[in-house]
């Protein structure tokens, strides 16, 4: 990245740091784990030699160069538990995020803690305007992680990724710097009262745009579906 270093970066429980060759065996071990690799696109098996090449290829860097990618180690109490992938476009203003976590540490909140800290640092100190992420549509846990960080679902690319010999769909999410503060400062308490109001021509457009998280749509009907049910019972 530019002159200022991105790493190391500390969170309440984690240290985000550059990889070292001492991490190669651990990186290879969890990247070969079927539970970790299931929704990822790296070649399998992910050998120690492949891990060493990845680490050596970014030696001396503390973050991605413009137009490149960089793997960030997620360290918990001196132990490698996963990694973040960070890509930057040529302008340095558009970032792409990826993440993977050891299967025995999934469900710990480490991935969202690490990704959230990285995103905040990119927005606050490095002039990044937008962070994007893509995922396998079947990876509901990853979609929920992005939703918890404030990402917005932007659509599905049909057969847009060639993964291990097959064309696959991917779901696309993004978060703007302008939206991050609003998300972090949103109200977490239930409203004191709820009022039912008539839908009128003046408010219909706003009502129609109401939505829930993508992963909750099978529990909560969309507004277009609700309108259709009311009009055509």
Regions flagged by a language model, labelled:
Residues 46-98, 102-104, 198-233:
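Acetyl-CoA-dependent GNAT
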Residues 40-44:
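Short histidine-centered catalytic/ligand-binding loop motif
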